[in-house]
Amino acid sequence: MAKKVEKIVKLQIPAGKATPAPPVGPALGQAGINIMGFTKEFNARTADQAGLIIPVVISVYEDRSFTFITKTPPAAVLLKKAAKIEKGSGEPNKTKVATVSSDQVKEIAELKMADLNAADVEAAMRMVAGTARSMGIIVE
């Protein structure tokens, strides 16, 4: 018989840098997960993606065991990396902070395709372009 899922915890953690300190420790402690076990496994799985923020969905079972799925980094993080900026614009409609090419947007859309509910790459590109617009990044 399959184990019953007791709780689902969603976090966004920098790749390879999960530590028992807040915010990871308290969130996992409340769910009853072995914090050190999770941090070691997460860091090992995401070591090759250093510098990116990785969303993770942790399923906690009745017997306190857990499994987790890592997702692709948020579009905003990938756009900031592509545009080589620290943060988006405070006033996206007035001040533009950077530009990205449509090729870069397509690359990000293809990477994010698994996590987006888009029918094709074109729709995914429109979603990524919308995120860029809301950050004050111009898509050329």
Curated annotation (Swiss-Prot):
A Pfam family annotated for this chain is Ribosomal_L11
Read off the SUPFAM superfamilies from this record: Ribosomal L11/L12e N-terminal domain, Ribosomal protein L11, C-terminal domain
Keywords for this entry?
Methylation, Ribonucleoprotein, Ribosomal protein, RNA-binding, rRNA-binding
Per the record, the domain of life is: Bacteria
Q: Which GO terms describe its molecular function?
A: large ribosomal subunit rRNA binding; structural constituent of ribosome
Biological process according to GO: translation
Q: Which InterPro entries match?
A: Ribosomal_uL11, Ribosomal_uL11_bac-typ, Ribosomal_uL11_C, Ribosomal_uL11_C_sf, Ribosomal_uL11_CS, Ribosomal_uL11_N, Ribosomal_uL11_N_sf
- Keyword NADP belongs to the record: no
Q: Which cysteines are joined by disulfide bonds?
A: none
Q: How is it modified after translation?
A: One or more lysine residues are methylated.
Annotated GO CC locations? cytosolic large ribosomal subunit
Q: Does the keyword rRNA-binding apply?
A: yes
Q: What does this protein do?
A: Forms part of the ribosomal stalk which helps the ribosome interact with GTP-bound translation factors.
Entry-linked PANTHER family? 60S RIBOSOMAL PROTEIN L12, LARGE RIBOSOMAL SUBUNIT PROTEIN UL11M
Q: How does it assemble?
A: Part of the ribosomal stalk of the 50S ribosomal subunit. Interacts with L10 and the large rRNA to form the base of the stalk. L10 forms an elongated spine to which L12 dimers bind in a sequential fashion forming a multimeric L10(L12)X complex.
Q: Which HAMAP family match?
A: Ribosomal_uL11
Q: Which family does the UniProt entry place this protein in? A: Belongs to the universal ribosomal protein uL11 family.
The protein's matches in NCBIfam families, at most eight in alphabetical order, are given as: L11_bact
The protein in question is named Large ribosomal subunit protein uL11
Q: What is the lineage of its organism?
A: Bacteria, Bacillati, Bacillota, Bacilli, Lactobacillales
The coding gene here is: rplK
